[in-house]
Amino acid sequence: MKAVIQRVSEARVEVDGSTVGAIGRGILVLLGVEKGDTERDAAWLAEKMAGLRIFEDDAGKMNLSVREVEGSILAVSQFTLAGNCAKGRRPSFDTAAPPDEGKRLYDRFVDLIRETGIPTATGIFQADMKVHLVNDGPVTFILDTKSRSSST
């Protein structure tokens, strides 16, 4: 699984001109599911997301998690994160999980985040979405479950 996470002061996702998910302060996560990803990957990523200290404390140091600042998470599926642009001019999506598996693991990731008690909004899997956000910082990170160490 690959995730692009952005610290936001607000974010929303629209489908067909209607807002389907919105948050105030928190994290926008764009999630791509790849072939070979498992529920273990979803669990690792959900745990990492809930505890990642990317919000500033009173001293201005990134020392607080989304839970500690009483923020929210907006999770948006984005299969293009599995795209490979190494050859030619058109991305290859050969490594993207099939839609049924991608949806199952995306839904599992969302369920696991919600189980932490963090308010979580979502987009709609496979929909053509418009994502609006105010990136706070900007603060953006890329997480890849395939490159995690065994100690994290």
Swiss-Prot record:
Family: Belongs to the DTD family.
Function: An aminoacyl-tRNA editing enzyme that deacylates mischarged D-aminoacyl-tRNAs. Also deacylates mischarged glycyl-tRNA(Ala), protecting cells against glycine mischarging by AlaRS. Acts via tRNA-based rather than protein-based catalysis; rejects L-amino acids rather than detecting D-amino acids in the active site. By recycling D-aminoacyl-tRNA to D-amino acids and free tRNA molecules, this enzyme counteracts the toxicity associated with the formation of D-aminoacyl-tRNA entities in vivo and helps enforce protein L-homochirality.
Primary gene name: dtd
Database matches in Gene3D superfamilies: D-tyrosyl-tRNA(Tyr) deacylase
Provenance organism: Geobacter sulfurreducens (strain ATCC 51573 / DSM 12127 / PCA)
Positions of short motif Gly-cisPro motif, important for rejection of L-amino acids: 137-138
Name of the protein: D-aminoacyl-tRNA deacylase
InterPro entries for the chain: Daa-tRNA_deacyls_DTD (IPR003732), DTD-like_sf (IPR023509)
Domain of life: Bacteria
Subcellular location: Cytoplasm
EC id: 3.1.1.96
Keyword terms: Cytoplasm, Hydrolase, RNA-binding, tRNA-binding
Xref: HAMAP family: Deacylase_Dtd
Cellular-component GO terms for this entry: cytoplasm
A single GO molecular function term of this UniProt record: D-tyrosyl-tRNA(Tyr) deacylase activity
